[in-house]
C-alpha cells in the first residue's frame, strides 16, 4: 500500500510534469483519517497516501506543472473483499461509489469522501482529541 502507491503515482506525476499536465485520481480510503486499532498498518498506509497526494499537489502548484489531483476516500464498499466477513456499517454499493467517483473527477475535486454519511463521520473523527480516540473501541 505504501511503496507501490508512491512509485506508481510518482511515475504518473513525472510523466504529466514532462508532458504539460494531467489529472491524477487515486482511490485511497477514509481509513487514513485517524489511526484505526483494528487495522493499524492499513490506516497508516492510507494516511501516507493522503499526505503524499497533498504534498504532490502542493509541489505541482509551486512548479506550475498543471497537474490536478483527486483523492477519492470511500467508506466500506460491498465488494468480494468484504463478503463473508464481519458486519460493516454503512456499506455502499459499487454502483453508488462508481457514480460518486466519476462525479468527483469531473468536478475536479481535490478530496472526495464518499458518501455524505462517511463525510460527516470522518469530520467528527478528526475533531475527537487523541486522548479520547485512544480509548474508543472500534472492533
Question: Each PLM stretch: what is its role?
Answer:
Residues 9, 45:
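Active-site helix of classical SDR
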Residues 34, 55-68:
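Active-site-adjacent segment of SDR/Rossmann-fold oxidoreductases
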Residues 71, 86-122:
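C-terminal helical subdomain
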Residues 34-40:
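Active-site loop immediately N-terminal to the catalytic Tyr-X3-Lys motif
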Residues 11-20:
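A short helix-coil junction within the Rossmann-fold of NAD(P)-dependent oxidoreductases
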Residues 29:
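Residue(s) in the substrate-gating loop at a strand-loop-helix junction
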Amino acid at each position: 500500500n505504501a511503496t507501490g502507491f508512491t512509485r506508481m503515482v510518482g511515475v504518473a506525476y513525472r510523466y504529466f510534469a514532462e508532458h504539460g499536465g494531467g489529472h491524477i485520481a487515486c482511490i485511497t480510503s477514509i481509513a487514513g483519517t485517524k489511526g484505526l486499532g483494528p487495522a493499524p498498518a492499513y490506516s497508516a498506509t492510507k494516511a501516507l497516501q493522503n499526505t503524499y497526494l497533498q504534498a504532490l499537489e502542493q509541489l505541482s502548484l509551486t512548479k506550475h506543472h498543471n497537474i490536478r489531483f483527486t483523492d477519492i476516500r470511500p467508506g466500506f464498499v460491498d465488494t468480494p473483499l468484504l463478503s463473508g466477513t464481519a458486519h460493516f456499517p454503512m456499506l455502499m454499493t459499487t454502483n453508488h461509489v462508481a457514480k460518486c467517483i466519476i462525479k468527483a473527477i469531473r468536478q475536479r475535486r481535490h478530496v472526495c469522501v464518499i458518501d455524505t454519511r462517511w463525510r460527516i463521520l470522518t469530520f467528527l473523527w478528526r475533531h475527537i482529541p487523541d486522548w479520547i480516540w485512544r480509548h474508543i473501541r472500534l472492533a
